[in-house]
């Protein structure tokens, strides 16, 4: 759903990438800083119930996902190592967001049910990424699906932000349901995406 906007977003980020390169910041540095920042914010802010603050800070660090590749292309240094590092660290960031949400519901959110749903969304997000990686290692394509990484991040972080603002009275209280609804969608969409990718790989393997 959101992958179609990636090219336009890259153009927006190009000036910032150029500025960082002028300061002698490397793409790998941006990748590491972005991942560490996102993981720390997710595992510190969300379990404490600092939802809107955490979502905002995590989003800022996740911007590095667009920056590092943009910087590498401007340097003409795109490499297998850079792609591998970026994909590997992305999994840490994705996992930390859902783990932070699960810890929130295990603590101040007081809901075993939604903690479990958050863990299910976490597992499915990791399996979705694994299916694609394994398919590509077998020279097959499995990029399709209704819940790509960009979709998962946008929906989860927007849902956390809305719920956080509703909890502090900035938005209507009924919007506290934004996060549970978002988790339900991501769990169902994740399961469908895994099924779509497995089906695609099966068809390719039999053709």
Describe the function of each predicted region.
Residues 1-59, 97-207:
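Hydrophobic alpha-helical transmembrane segments
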Residues 63-71, 84, 88-92, 96, ...:
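Active-site His/Glu-centered metal-binding helix of metallohydrolases
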Residues 50-77:
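Hydrophobic/aromatic-rich structural module bridging two neighboring secondary-structure elements via a short loop
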Residues 10, 14, 68-90, 141-147:
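Juxtamembrane helix-capping/reentrant segments at transmembrane boundaries
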Residues 60, 77, 81, 85, ...:
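Hydrophobic alpha-helical segments and helix-packing faces
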């Amino acid at each position: 759903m959101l992958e179609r906007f990636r090219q336009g977003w890259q153009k927006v980020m190009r000036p910032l990438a150029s500025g960082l390169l002028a300061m002698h910041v490397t793409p790998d540095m941006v990748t590491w800083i972005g991942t560490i920042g996102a993981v720390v914010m997710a595992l510190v802010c969300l379990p404490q119930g600092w939802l809107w603050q955490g979502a905002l800070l995590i989003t800022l660090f996740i911007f590095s996902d667009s920056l590092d590749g943009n910087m590498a292309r401007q340097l003409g240094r795109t490499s297998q190592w850079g792609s591998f590092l970026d994909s590997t660290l992305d999994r840490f960031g994705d996992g930390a967001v859902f783990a932070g949400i699960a810890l929130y519901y295990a603590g101040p959110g007081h809901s075993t049910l939604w903690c479990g749903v958050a863990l299910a969304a976490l597992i499915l997000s990791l399996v979705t990424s694994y299916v694609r990686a394994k398919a590509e290692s077998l020279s097959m394509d499995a990029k399709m699906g209704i819940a790509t990484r960009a979709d998962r991040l946008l929906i989860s972080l927007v849902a956390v932000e809305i719920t956080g603002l509703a909890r502090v009275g900035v938005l209507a209280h009924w919007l506290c349901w934004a996060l549970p609804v978002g988790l339900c969608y991501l769990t169902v969409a994740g399961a469908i995406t895994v099924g779509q990718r497995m089906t695609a790989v099966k068809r390719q393997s039999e053709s």
